[in-house]
Swiss-Prot record:
Keyword Transmembrane: no
Compartment annotation: Secreted
Species for this entry: Caenorhabditis elegans
Enzymatic reactions: a sphingomyelin + H2O = phosphocholine + an N-acylsphing-4-enine + H(+); an N-acyl-15-methylhexadecasphing-4-enine-1-phosphocholine + H2O = an N-acyl-15-methylhexadecasphing-4-enine + phosphocholine + H(+)
Hydrolase recorded as keyword: yes
Binding-site residues, Zn(2+) 2: D234, N274, H381, H415
GO BP of this protein: ceramide biosynthetic process; sphingomyelin catabolic process
Major location (coarse): secreted
UniProt-listed InterPro entries: ASM_C (IPR045473), ASMase/PPN1_MPP (IPR041805), Calcineurin-like_PHP_ApaH (IPR004843), Metallo-depent_PP-like (IPR029052), Saposin-like (IPR011001), SaposinB_dom (IPR008139), Sphingomy_PDE (IPR011160)
Signal peptide bounds: 1-17
Cofactor(s) annotated in UniProt: Zn(2+)
Protein's recorded name: Sphingomyelin phosphodiesterase 1
Amino acid sequence: MRIIYLISTVLLIYTNATVLRTKESIQNKVTYDKYGFQPLCISCTGLISVASFFLKFDVSEPVILEFATIVCKLFAKQPWAVCDGISSQFRDEFFYVFRRLANESPSQICGIILPDCADPTDPSESGWMVALPPKPKRTRISKKKVQKKPNMSMSQNLNVLQLTDLHVDFEYKYPSEANCDDPVCCRVSVSEPKKAAGYWGSVGKCDIPFWTVENMLSHINKTHMIDMVIMTGDYINHVDWEYSIEEHLSVLRKLHRLVQNTFPSTPIYWALGNHEGVPVNSFAPHSVDERFWPTWLYKEFQTMSGPWLSEGAKDSLLKRGSYSTQVMDGLKLITLNTGFCEVTNFFLYLNQSDPDSSMSWFVKELFESEKKGEQVYVLAHIPPGDSECLEGWAFNYYRVIQRFSSTIAAQFFGHDHLDYFTVFYEDMHNVSSKPISVGYASPSVTTFEYQNPAYRIYEIDPYNKFKIVDFTTYYADLEKATEDKKPVWEKLYSARQAHGMDDLSPLSWNKVIQKLFTSEKKREKFYQYAFRNFSPQCDSTCQMQLMCNLRMGHHNSTLYCPTF
């Protein structure tokens, strides 16, 4: 055995997928100092060399883990409980993966994880390409054939509710400290907190209490007519150093029961988020040992979405965490497991090439819909252009969107907790080319970190290729809520009104981007929407990243970013 858990320390310090949640990936962290060196690459190879020395002298795994915990404590500046918990969580996974990379040199291993440190060798096959079929003769579906299912309302347009990134914390305490030194606060009761946690939640390093989610769903049920609910992942809190399968199942079942009871006759579709993994971000493909397979999780999601899925869809969910289902005549919904693009899903570094054939399956489902003249909604958690998504997966996803842009009516994402959208182009390397599709990243329910809770409702025209006519985002200002005064859920904005749009076509969204890039006033309003009327410390780097997201469908370069 020539490789180590120590590399995990580099990842814990430099990626956003862990408790540190820096909002920047290791892919964007490789920089040069004034002498032309790459400190992160040097640190990576240095740690692996140290580990090789340890292992050469048969140092035991527990000792290596303890050393990794110490390094985590010193460099990541996290409490012992956090570093020790992460070490325990990832122990088996790390040793399993890195033992199988034993024949690779330190520079090759660092090149796998940090692309800008890349060695010419690519043992993980990150440059894989999914096969795309030629375009067939298109058959048009008649408007007369489009009929709502009995469980849908008979209104002209349909209302689709999106809830994402709930991150419910069943250990939320009131009163408690909201400004603590731990990665997640509002969990420890204190008599005199420096900053007291609010009863309904606290905007900051805190997740949302269960009773606030109950309040939100009750409000939605009383206020809106909902025809379909889409859940785009991350239902578990951010205390990922304490994750367990038993606790995950308990949270998922409580949340499923609440949502199901709120909308007993409404179709509800659930997607997996990276925080559903145990350890966090861990989604083992079937190419690794069976003991790592997240079968327990896939089975639970079978139960959660069960009433609305066919047996074939359930089988697909159990195989890859993804499924497709016929929502109504002329409309298919495809739910993708983006755990297979997660940059800290370490199993992928053994082989990134189409884990569990998910991308090939995605293409097959789209091709079938294309031949039938159907429209498709894509439901997933991590947007492909997010820094937490591997470029190999993002690049192939973008290619699929290009090929099937006339079939894909909309893409729905979560993950970033912020409110934004991404335009996809006919040429992924040229933002002056034709806009062909839009991905919607919906705002989170959780307040982690530093935004008010929100939900979104899309207005859909079922008689015009299931196009999104408009959407409205609602939020609650938790600073105005008290123990005796419930949150007020109110309209934040509607897309067409806020951005002065004639429609929500890719071309119209591209025009919105152009306006945002040239108008500081419009950008300020956009930032306000992104954080739901909360004033965070969003500096110039933060603001630039939000603008880059608008055209960042993958990670090719910074050409997507504005130059203001």
